[in-house]
Swiss-Prot record:
It is an enzyme of class 6 (ligase). It is found in: Cytoplasm. This is Phosphoribosylformylglycinamidine cyclo-ligase. Its EC number is 6.3.3.1. Gene3D superfamilies: PurM-like C-terminal domain, PurM-like, N-terminal domain. It catalyses: 2-formamido-N(1)-(5-O-phospho-beta-D-ribosyl)acetamidine + ATP = 5-amino-1-(5-phospho-beta-D-ribosyl)imidazole + ADP + phosphate + H(+). The gene is purM. Belongs to the AIR synthase family. One of its GO terms (cellular component) is cytosol. InterPro entries: PurM-like_C_dom (IPR010918), PurM-like_C_sf (IPR036676), PurM-like_N (IPR016188), PurM-like_N_sf (IPR036921), PurM_cligase (IPR004733). Keywords: ATP-binding, Cytoplasm, Ligase, Nucleotide-binding, Purine biosynthesis.
Amino acid sequence: MSKQPSLSYKDAGVDIDAGEALVERIKSVAKRTARPEVMGGLGGFGALCEIPAGYKQPVLVSGTDGVGTKLRLALNLNKHDSIGIDLVAMCVNDLVVCGAEPLFFLDYYATGKLNVDTAAQVVTGIGAGCELSGCSLVGGETAEMPGMYEGEDYDLAGFCVGVVEKAEIIDGSKVAAGDALLALPSSGPHSNGYSLIRKIIEVSGADIESIQLDGKPLTDLLMAPTRIYVKPLLKLIKDTGAVKAMAHITGGGLLDNIPRVLPKGAQAVVDVASWQRPAVFDWLQEKGNVDEHEMHRVLNCGVGMVICVAQDQVENALKVLREAGEQPWVIGQIATAAEGAAQVELKNLKAH
């Protein structure tokens, strides 16, 4: 008989019991998000979902994303209750820009050592995001990988599938000179630019936990969950049929994201003085001495979603969005691009 001790998975740093305890805690979260098309609950090898009734030529739309280094800030602040909302938002906002209704969502949670309480907070946030977007949390993977992550540090990825009627796909092909650009406000930096944000905090030496802006703790402003625009935008599409293009303003800001939905020869002319930039962006710019152009190339600067409609549809679109609880702005229009011109022109940039 060997004198070597009998090794278990737990000795190697993987706690199967903790994983099972987490699954039990999050079953109710998944149940709250259930859509009628979803067949069965958590625990199967694969999640089954029917195409919703009423579609003539349904097209499935998929997307995947993470939350970037906002996660590092969440870990540093030990704030895990809303990062799951960010994860869902980053995926579903990308789907809705082509007119798709999100159907189901899966998450991937990888960690060095599973903290069941932390993971349950994260997944509860994912469930809240799914409820806000009307999509079903159908499964996920929790991977405990000792030696791959430091301690209880974790990483997140989300995967979402939606559906859109083939004849109603929004792809920007009908965008024309003279069209108007509307915008929906962001809640803050959302889930992009956090490597710059963290560098600004580091270089400035700011104690972000003691600073207040406009009466709100700076940590709350930096960690505010990414807004989920799905329900108001689906209502806008359904009630008006006027949406020609939409751009989710993520990494790359207005400068890199609007061109993704513009046809060749079109230029977006955006007046940056047409909306009130939240104080958190001014604080970041000042503390990091960040160039104004760089601000708009990295951060959303207060705009989370841009919508293109014909000029004669502006008032109707604004009305529908306001009725849905949004506070939209008209921020610019589409022009014919001059030879060699950038696809986005920002007017009234602050001198810095």
